[in-house]
From Swiss-Prot:
This is Large ribosomal subunit protein bL20. GO terms for molecular function: rRNA binding; structural constituent of ribosome. Binds directly to 23S ribosomal RNA and is necessary for the in vitro assembly process of the 50S ribosomal subunit. It is not involved in the protein synthesizing functions of that subunit. One of its GO terms (biological process) is ribosomal large subunit assembly. Belongs to the bacterial ribosomal protein bL20 family. Pfam families: Ribosomal_L20. It comes from Neisseria meningitidis serogroup B (strain ATCC BAA-335 / MC58). GO terms for cellular component: cytosolic large ribosomal subunit. Keywords: Ribonucleoprotein, Ribosomal protein, RNA-binding, rRNA-binding. InterPro entries: Ribosomal_bL20, RIBOSOMAL_L20_CS, Ribosomal_protein_bL20_C. PROSITE patterns: RIBOSOMAL_L20. SUPFAM superfamilies: Ribosomal protein L20.
Amino acid sequence: MPRVKRGVTARARHQKIFALAKGYRGRRKNVYRVAKQAVMKAGQYAYRDRRQRKRQFRQLWIVRINAGTRENGLSYSKFMNGLKRASIEIDRKVLADLAVFDKAAFAQLVEKAKAALAA
């Protein structure tokens, strides 16, 4: 049985890492050992940040809704409670969009929430 030389597989493995490290600065793009570490770390950041992105967008939506409700004389928590009591099921993403781009429609929602809280 002939001995297996690793030239082809090693080169393929290195090329795969270098392709992933394309665009990196310094030795991170052309030294295999450093590039491999950089790609691994990038993968960890990507994994973590895919989860953080969901949290950050929810925070952004809440900030925008809060700003819109305070313009109409209500706090965020009371507004959300009012919507729940009024049986209005609109998610925060859509509410934030309304608060920024359609202030009239958002003001009507705030009035409905106020009415539901008063009742």
